[in-house]
Amino acid sequence: MRSEVVLAEVTREDVARIADWLEDPEVSEMWFGRYTYGEPAHLGYEPRKMIDANEVEWDEVFHDPHHEPHRSILSVRTASGEHIGEAQLAIDEALGDAQLSILIGRKELWHRGYGTATVISCLDHIFRNLGLFRAWVDVPEYNTSARDMFEHLGFIHEGTLRQSRPHDGARHNSVILGMLANEYTRLSDSISQGTHSV
């Protein structure tokens, strides 16, 4: 049975959980790593600061449609409503593409299909709702599980960023993987027909 997720609006409680999850080095390394000064890296906002942000600051991060590139930040929930992670889409309407970033913060749920379900939900949104042409990800080479998942779904290797990620005292490459709208249509059809395992 396929794991199911719901993409939902972010709450302050969700941000607090994200901040707590990122304190775990294993979780933060699979997300964006750590800044050179040691704090967990996070795109779009700093979780600890956002917990107490005023309404204007909150809206600038989570509801500002004029920010370029437009960043859509969503909480990932199980079908029963339990918060388990975060999905971000950096949307460039002029280019017709969106970069995906997915975090399942609950480690005990890793390798149980929630990341895959989140990617599929994001792809549905990118291609069906937004009508974009391309989706892409930037995956550090040491996160082999993520790369395998994206490639299993049909993402294609588009390039390598050399030594772009600091990790364990060294620099590592990251890979750019992409999917085009017509490739997603084939994936979606094969999932609905049961000919593609997820």
Region roles according to the model:
Residues 1-108, 171-172, 179-198:
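GNAT-family acyltransferases
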Residues 17, 99, 117, 134, ...:
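Amphipathic alpha-helical recognition patches that constitute DNA-binding helices
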Residues 106-108, 112, 141-142:
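Active-site acidic-Proline motif in GNAT/NAT acetyltransferases
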Residues 111-125, 147-152:
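Conserved acetyl-CoA-binding loop-helix of GNAT-fold acetyltransferases
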Residues 119, 143-146, 163-168:
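Short glycine/proline-centered loop/turn elements that form peptide/ligand docking sites
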Residues 128-138:
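Conserved GNAT acetyl-CoA-binding A-motif
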Residues 136-139, 156-172:
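Conserved catalytic-core motifs of GNAT/GCN5-like acyltransferases
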Residues 150, 155, 177:
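Conserved active-site tyrosine of GNAT-family acetyltransferases
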